[in-house]
């Protein structure tokens, strides 16, 4: 069982996934800071100095913190848009590489007429070279 686990854990896909999760977590922190420390204060300033983190409703004893929810929604939208742009960039790069490979692989094929003309040219060259 230990051998199976080692084989599973060392495979490239698992390691790639782990790296992706770690980078994703770090990216999430960066985006959260961007939203909480830059975007939302600017939006609050534009809307008249509102601090979104403190917005809430009192319903009896409960406090509904809709300001924090709004920040989380903006956080999600920024992350989703960033991922969209990244995936779009990767797709464009993939298409470019694919087109380059296709153009390399599709060597121009000569028609019968072109083949005959090439043979005639080569024969004429041979005749000129031999006295």
Swiss-Prot record:
GO CC terms on record? plasma membrane
Bilayer topology annotation:
Multi-pass membrane protein
* Gene3D superfamilies reported for this sequence: Large-conductance mechanosensitive channel, MscL, domain 1 (1.10.1200.120)
- Name where it's found: Cell membrane
Provide an example Pfam family for this protein.
MscL
- Presence of keyword Transmembrane: yes
The reply on keyword Lyase is no
Its keywords, alphabetically, are:
Cell membrane, Ion channel, Ion transport, Membrane, Transmembrane, Transmembrane helix, Transport
Annotated GO MF terms: mechanosensitive monoatomic ion channel activity
Main location (coarse class): membrane
Q: Where are the transmembrane segments?
A: 8-28, 30-50, 67-87
What's the subunit arrangement here?
Homopentamer.
Write out the function statement from the record. Answer: Channel that opens in response to stretch forces in the membrane lipid bilayer. May participate in the regulation of osmotic pressure changes within the cell.
Which PANTHER family does this chain map to? LARGE-CONDUCTANCE MECHANOSENSITIVE CHANNEL, MECHANOSENSITIVE CHANNEL MSCL
- What family name appears in the similarity comment? Belongs to the MscL family.
What name does UniProt use for this protein?
Answer: Large-conductance mechanosensitive channel
State the species of origin.
Anoxybacillus flavithermus (strain DSM 21510 / WK1)
Q: Which gene encodes it?
A: mscL
